[in-house]
Amino acid sequence: MESAIAKTGPITALGAMSGTSLDGVDAAIVVTDGVAIDGFGASAYEPYSDAQRAVLAKALGQWQGADVEAATGVIEQVHRTVLARFQQARLIGFHGQTLAHAPHTQGTLQVGDGAWLATALDRPVIWDFRTRDVEMGGEGAPLAPFFHFACAKYIGATQPLAFLNLGGVGNLTYVDPSFARPEEVGALLAFDTGPANAPVNDLVQARLGLAYDRDGQVAREGTVCQRVLERALTAPYFARIPPKSLDRNDFSQIVDLVDTLPDADAVATLTALSAAAVSQGVRHCPQVPQQVLVTGGGRKNPVLMEMLQSMLACPVKPVEDVGLDGDMLEAQAFAYLGVRVARGLPTSCPGTTGVRAPVGGGRISYPGTAAMAAQTG
């Protein structure tokens, strides 16, 4: 396949994401010039087996060693399997799997070799999106906000709104679509709100042998312990001014707070914490968004959605209500960001990660060649 990336016009790009929930790999096509979204294409999901998930979970929080190498192998092989289905893609935006994230001390680690994938798939691969942002003083996360800005334009939004991703960690993006470009001051504010699905998933796995609380069934049977909830909300992270970001394990001790609660009460309390973290986060926005559009697995939990609506002073709805795909939005984001990197456009800015100036990170690997830095800013 011809490996050159067109310098102008829309590109059929493929994005891939493996999130902190460790459920599997999402892959999706976006047609874009790196500024506007022309349209969306096919998508696919490849779940991890129980054995693969165990390998990944064992490596969480580690920076090197045998466990990290084993996790890298899982990520590369599963991505190769799912991405090979998309022969129409001209380039691939590959996020990899975050194992550790400590931007102000050790940096950030996403495993998976984009250069290896480029050769294996015979496509240019854009990868290592976060390192440059961290090197320039940013949090390295979240990175989806520039795509959220494009989505707001795509759906014709004219008033400020927010995108809320409820994965293992919650991420909020405030978008003012009156601005022309996402890097303009005031166009975006983005940050991690706090724990979302990860503590609940970990708890129901440990106590009940469940992968997650399907449809909020366990939480529905429980009662929120206000004492524990209020104590959890005293964590210093919630008072920090954004931009700010989290590692999946930063709130692992939260599960300890519900140790003495019955199963259903513990799950209900952790679910309420996810919603309360978002409610506190929205207070940091320049103004109350006209609507909050929810993506990620958390939007499928009716108890969590009800809690969010009760705590927020604006409509809360799944992104499907405006014609977007809540299962694939993060994968689509990395397709979009891949094109921006290839075109030399920024992928983060002070309002999204706290980086000193708008910057475009990432490396580009072509089939059979080494990776090249592709940076702006």
Curated annotation (Swiss-Prot):
Catalytic EC class: transferase
Sample GO molecular function, one term: kinase activity
The residues listed in the UniProt record as binding ATP, with positions renumbered to this chain, are: 19-26
Has the keyword Transmembrane been applied to this entry? no
Where are the annotated coiled coils located? none
* Disulphide-bridged cysteine pairs: none
Kindly state which keywords UniProt assigns to this record, in alphabetical order.
Answer: ATP-binding, Carbohydrate metabolism, Kinase, Nucleotide-binding, Transferase
Give the catalytic activity.
1,6-anhydro-N-acetyl-beta-muramate + ATP + H2O = N-acetyl-D-muramate 6-phosphate + ADP + H(+)
The superkingdom of the source organism is Bacteria
- Protein's name in the database: Anhydro-N-acetylmuramic acid kinase
